[in-house]
Amino acid sequence: VVRVNLIGSFNVLSRAAGAMAATEPLDEDGQRGAVVNMASAAAFDGQIGQASYSASKGGIVGMTLPIARDLAAVGVRVNTIAPGLIDTPIYGEGEQSDAFKAHLGQSVLFPKRLGSSEELAFMVMDLLTNPYMNGEVVRVDGGIRMPPK
């Protein structure tokens, strides 16, 4: 889990940043690109049995600011999103899946539902297009704080 989630994210970011750094600046500030990493609410609220997953996502959170500082010299911004419960195919389909998702949604502060992939994509777009957003971790989770189990 750590190899794929953390080391894989670091390796992809390193390659992408190297390619971005080799390009001409996109604007008068000297920006050459932006990276948005994906962590998880588990980085902050890991549940029982999730130690390696939480550590892998916590590592992504932890590397965000130092890498943003490193890449500032070449005009590359770095931010991270820590999604909560997002409605994806991982939950399956059908009546039983819908009931499970509704149950999970009740643990969200507001709105009492799972987030949508579109809502997550909106945040990705915000982080990519706002030139003053750098070195930040943004939770897109409806205010949920996961219980231990």
Briefly describe each language-model feature range.
Residues 13, 56, 64:
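Active-site helix of classical SDR
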Residues 116-140, 145:
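C-terminal substrate-recognition "lid" of short-chain dehydrogenase/reductases
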Residues 1-11, 36, 60:
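Catalytic Tyr-X3-Lys loop
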Residues 45-51, 74, 112:
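Active-site loop immediately N-terminal to the catalytic Tyr-X3-Lys motif
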Residues 72, 77, 134-136:
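Short, small/polar-rich loop/turn modules that mediate ligand/substrate recognition or access, typified
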Residues 40:
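Residue(s) in the substrate-gating loop at a strand-loop-helix junction
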Residues 98-118:
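Catalytic Tyr-x(3-8)-Lys segment
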Residues 18, 69-70:
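Alpha-helical segment proximal to the catalytic Tyr-Lys
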